[in-house]
Amino acid sequence: MLGYLVWAQESKPKAGPESAGGAVGGSPPANPNPYEPSKDKDESVACRKNLQKINAAIQAYRKDHQDVPNWLSDLVPKYLADTNVLICPVTKRTGHQSPFGVLDPKVRSSYLYEFTTTPIPEIVKGTFPGSDMTMRDWKRQQMKLAGQQVPLVRCLLHEPALNLSIGGKVYESPVYWELNFTNEAGLSAFSPH
C-alpha cells in the first residue's frame, strides 16, 4: 500500500562512493533524477506565493465556469498570464518536475493538479487501490472525508510537501496529505471506491 512512498525512498541516493558523482568504475548513477525534495525555506516561501497566485486564477475561472478547470493550462492566458508562476523555484534550480501524478500536457508546470479528468495514474493506484475513476471523481469522493482541505494543486518538490486546498488554503503535509486526516478515517477510507 505504501508503494509510492517506498519508491520515493528507494530513489534517494545512498551513502557511499556510488553517490559521489556516479557509481564506482565511472558508470552513471542508477537514477539520474532521484526524488530529493528541497528543505530550503526560501524556496518554500516562493512556492507558496506561486500557489496563492494559482489559487486566485482558479477562483476567477470557477466564477466564470462554475467548476474547476480540467488542467492548469486552461488558466492560461486569460486567468494566468505569467506561466512562470507554474514553475516552482526547485524546478528552476534543478530542472526536476514532480515524480508523481499527471503532468499538464499543454504547459510546463512543476505543480500537480489533482482535479484532472484523467484516470488515476498507476503510481497512485499502487498506493490507493480501488475502483477505476478519474482524479476529479476521486478527489470529490475524498472531500466527503476531508472537506475543503483536499488538495487541488500540490508541489511535492519540498519537504514537507505544499498543498493548495480546494478551499484556497496553502498548507504543508507529508507526501501523503491523507495522513493528516487518519484520526477521522483510516487511510484506506481515502482509496477510490
List where the protein language model places each region.
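Active-site-flanking ligand-binding surface segments in enzyme catalytic domains
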Residues: 102-193
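Conserved hydrophobic/amphipathic alpha-helical signal-anchor segments
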Residues: 7-85, 170, 180-181, 185-191
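Short cysteine-rich clusters marking metal-coordination/redox-active sites
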Residues: 88
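Hydrophobic membrane-insertion alpha-helices, especially the h-region
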Residues: 1-4
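Activation segment
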Residues: 84, 97, 172-174
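Acidic glycine-/aspartate-rich tracts in secreted/extracellular proteins
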Residues: 91-94
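N-terminal pilin/flagellin-like segments and related low-complexity appendage regions
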Residues: 61, 97-98, 113
